[in-house]
Amino acid sequence: MSPSGSTKGESSGLNQHYEEKVRPCIDLVDSLRALGVEKDLNLPAIAVIGDQSSGKSSVLEALSGVALPRGTGIVTRCPLVLKLKKITKDKSWHGLLTYNDKIRELKDPAKIEKAVLNAQTALAGIGEGISHEMITLEIQSCDVPDLTLIDLPGIARVATGNQPEDIEKQIKSLIEKFIKRQETISLVVVPANIDIATTEALKMASTVDPTGQRTLGILTKPDLVDRGMEDTVVRTVNNEVIPLKKGYMIVKCRGQQDINDKLGLVEALEKERRFFDENVHFRSLLEDRKATIPLLAERLTKELVEHIAKNLPQLQNQLEMKLEKTSADLRGLGDGVPLDKNEKSNFLIMKIRQFNDVLERVQMAEEDVEKPNTRVFSKIRSEFVKWKRILDSKAIKTEETLRDEVQEYVKTRRGKELPGFVNYRTFENIVKKHIAELHEPALKLLKDVTDIVHSSVDHIVNAHFSSFSPLMRAAKDPTEDFLHEQFQRAEEKIHSQFRMEKIVYSQDDLYSDQLTTAKNTLRGYGLQSPNVSADVREMAYHLTSYLTIACERLANQIPLIVQYHMLNQYISQLQNAMLGLIGKNSPGMLLCEDSGVARKRKDLKERLERLKSAGRVLSKFVHSA
């Protein structure tokens, strides 16, 4: 038997219209996959899926010309990347099996099946479990099409034998990982002798691709179709039953009896063509180029090349975004800890200095922020604005309700004064009542600003020291202690401020000016009405004047207290404490890097190299196209 598994006449004509475009396109994706960037990028691909015993392995066997693992139960236990390369100069057959960083050259196609089985056992273990790890089988021959396919495990509905109980869920999860990508064409293999609407493979494909834009149906086993059902099969292939954008094709591969009779793959292709040519029902499908393995190979190559070309711009965008993010993540982790003792000390000084510099910029409201984030002081300023609104609303509310309030006081507490004389004690009591109502909002302002500063500093500590647990702990203690200390000091000052506000005081000229303004302003509030007594009118003027002055004083004083303690003093204390760590502790103790961080840095460096290599491959392809 020829290792090619295809008739010379058919295979020599395969893809002759695409020879200049086909190989470079497919080589591009194969090269990217070989670099390992499939972990990072969604590469254009054709994934082959089907229920168990759908004939999926037989189709791949016919396309590749080699015997692949087949039988009952789960045959494909790992994703198998089948890379077929058509060569013209060298007539010899070459095989290359790669998995888990192992490479095995194969000179005899008869050894493929066992080699793939051994690879599956190495990755998925003994038994019938599956693995997400990929096996790559590359075949170079003059008789194969230029094509790359990904063979996925057949869908099992019920666990049998020593299969895991959740084997169906595992397989579906693996299949979905591939076919849900917009870059993947799903090649759905379905036996022609069953109702295709009941197949799990087609259901899965339609779930992730409801319009059938990325799905091509392949019907197998046409020789097993019940008599009278042939027209239904023809209608299915003609896209009249369950329409798919890419439509359907039909093939007849070797059955078990053919294998038992030692029917070679070359003879099987000849037998397939005769079957369609001589079948009165299916002959039209052959005439429409919708039947036989060679025509399927040609169609798949065309589909893959067009799909790669279509997805190339998105692939380039994906690559650029991943490169940018990986570089940023790597910068965020920083360099690893030096081994030299002196260099370690310098490294610690650098880390603390960088941390303190960021704190300084926060204090000066000059830190760098990326959208949609906001500078710390901008958030604090928003809280100060809210505080000012509270004071303003207090003044407005006072003007609106003052008349009734003063009338009540005059009615219940007026002494021997003649009309028009202001009772100073009544004036003081009303002032103190209104100012006392501002005490709690002032304390809330302090708490809200403290939360903003705490969150920001905590984020900065994590950003700079999260890789070093001892240094992180050393930084966390003063962060919390000094915050609590400055909060208490600010809180006491606010209490003190409101105790002072119980003393009713203002400079005479300031008060006189404000009183004049109040009299001019309040005339519109009904205070000139004959129903308002002179006592009420005069008291309202004085109260409005004083509360306006007091609110203006508090509008500045409370934010000053909060800013001084929770930003200036707190950050200065924290900076000094961090500098103090340099002399107190051994750099080696503080700079003990978490193993997870070192591993992540290594992974990011490897990813960056993969992506850069992929970028060079893509760039070379684009410029040579």
Swiss-Prot record:
Coiled coil: none
Region (G3 motif): 151-154
Compartment(s) of residence: Cytoplasm
Binding residues for GTP: 50-57, 151-155, 220-223
GO MF assignments: GTP binding; GTPase activity; microtubule binding
Alphabetical list of InterPro entries matching this protein: Dynamin, Dynamin_GTPase, Dynamin_GTPase_CS, Dynamin_N, Dynamin_stalk, G_DYNAMIN_dom, GED, GED_dom
Region (G2 motif): 75-77
Keyword Transcription: no
Keywords: Cytoplasm, GTP-binding, Nucleotide-binding
Domain GED: 536-625
Residues covered by region (G4 motif): 220-223
SMART domains, per the entry: DYNc, GED
Gene Ontology CC terms, in alphabetical order: cytoplasm; microtubule; nucleus; plasma membrane; presynapse; synapse
PROSITE patterns in the cross-refs: G_DYNAMIN_1 (PS00410), G_DYNAMIN_2 (PS51718), GED (PS51388)
Induction of expression: By interferons.
Protein family according to the UniProt entry: Belongs to the TRAFAC class dynamin-like GTPase superfamily. Dynamin/Fzo/YdjA family.
PANTHER family: DYNAMIN, INTERFERON-INDUCED GTP-BINDING PROTEIN MXC-RELATED
This protein's name: Interferon-induced GTP-binding protein MxE
Protein's organism: Danio rerio
